[in-house]
Amino acid sequence: VASGLIAPWCLSRAEGSQAASTLAAVLAGEQVIALAWQPEQGCLEPDGTGLLATPQAEGSLRVSGTARFAAPASADGFLVAARLPEGLALGLLPRDRDGLVRLDEPAADGTASALLRLSDVRLAADELLARGPGAGSLLRDALDVALVASAAELVGLMDHALDLTLDYLRTRKQFGKPIGSFQALQHRAVDLWIQRQLARAAVDAAVAVLDSPGADARARTQAASSAKARAAHAALMLCNQSVQLHGAIGFTDEYELGIYLNRALSLSAWLGNAAEHRRRWGALADASGALTA
């Protein structure tokens, strides 16, 4: 869900007939466009893109470099962010463009992202969506939205995983009574409920910041990192503990809980895990003076 928001967000704010026609195709379900920019895990800022662009005649570019985690790998095209001397360039590349090599990288939840290797790939002038400082701002805003959306998805899977676990505690019997009647397990279940509520509160707070017309770019990014850090940490804790509370059945791929666990493993790492976003939040807070004694 979250990865599907980035391309429409950028396309709807870009100019030109190419952006408009591609946006219409994406909204109609005729095309899927994946963002490609991260050279490695832990790169959270658009300026850290692994793609370099060289200006050519008539406004075109030649792009080379490596980008990972373009999801989904089966996308019809890629929204690439490449570095120029004056900032970033955002452009659309079809998956079959000459010089573009794609390798699938499977994830824990059964999905796959693409590793792209670009060697002097031509990006035509009419395929450019934005360039310069505006391109960086556009991508940063899109990533903030995607982070909050991924945090919201994590909260949603926590809802289902917790409901499944509580129902199991009510029905599974041991020593002649439901195991949910044992106080030690009740305490663990309450801890999971608290983690879910904290994650939901962080997402609600981030949505409020993103919806606020007065929020600046730093506040939006800080709120997005806060939501992702909290939700990623809580989702992994809740799903891991839910497996323990279920016992042996929680380890089986056929059981529904495994779907939530594997999705939490994959989504919590996408666009940065909890630890990376805590560090990012701290750096932003420090830069703004919020941590000054």
What are these regions (language model features)?
Residues 25, 29, 55-57, 61, ...:
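Alpha-helical interface subdomain recognition
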Residues 29-40:
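A short, Trp-centered hydrophobic/proline-enriched beta-strand micro-motif
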Residues 35, 91, 118, 158, ...:
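Residue-level signal for inorganic ion chemistry
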